[in-house]
Amino acid sequence: MVSKNSKMQATLAVNSVLASLLPGAAAITGSNKKVSKPRVAKAQLIDMNLKKRLELQEKDVYLEKRKEKRARKSTLRKRREEEFEMEQKAKLQILNKHREQGTLTQKEKAYLDELAKRNTKKLKSWDLEDDVKEDFLEIQAQILNDTKESSKRRSSKKKNKNKGFKQTLSSSSKVQDHRYPGLTPGLAPVGLSDEEESSDDE
């Protein structure tokens, strides 16, 4: 049998030859045994498993919290939407009452017009049933007719005011209009000359 010292010397010699001929080549080890990974103790394995389990539990808790948060948000959103719809219905009832009584303010009319425009856009984008469309179009036509009538009344009032103002102007004797046909303001009348005017003055 070959001694350990002679084996070690032989491997050193081979390694030096390899290093001189092939720089960067891997050195040969003296033992034929495979290099095994260091064994992990059982306590370490248990510790690693516990850590993994804790991570998974934390992840599950995080996911559960996220689900709960989403559910809370959705219920809150639904509640807000329901409240908003109730407010809108109440507003519309009040506006209908005002419209029937004829006491709509400018703000309320503008709101109704805006609502009608919005709803027509929705109608165009949605594919509603015929009954719903007919109902909506009737309501819209009614609102538009009411607003047109009120604007006609306003314009007729304005016209009447203007007529009255013009009549008071023409009837008053203080304001007189001295105009001659075919003249530019500031020029003498057609039949008169400057000499005639001066002789009239003297």
Curated annotation (Swiss-Prot):
UniProt-annotated stretches for the region Disordered: 145-202
Protein family (similarity comment): Belongs to the RRT14 family.
Annotated coiled-coil segments of the chain: none
The keyword Transcription regulation belongs to this UniProt entry's keyword annotation: yes
General function of this protein: Involved in ribosome biogenesis, probably through modulation of rDNA transcription.
Principal place of residence: nucleus
Cell compartment(s), UniProt: Nucleus, Nucleolus
Gene encoding the protein: RRT14
Biased composition (Acidic residues): 193-202
Superkingdom assignment: Eukaryota
Keywords, sorted A to Z: Nucleus, Transcription, Transcription regulation
Species the sequence originates in: Candida glabrata (strain ATCC 2001 / BCRC 20586 / JCM 3761 / NBRC 0622 / NRRL Y-65 / CBS 138) (Yeast)
UniProt-listed InterPro entries: Rrt14 (IPR031404)
Polar residues bias locations: 165-174
Pfam families, sorted: RRT14
Record's compositionally biased regions (Basic residues): 153-164
Protein name per UniProt: Regulator of rDNA transcription 14
One Gene Ontology cellular component annotation held by this UniProt entry: nucleolus
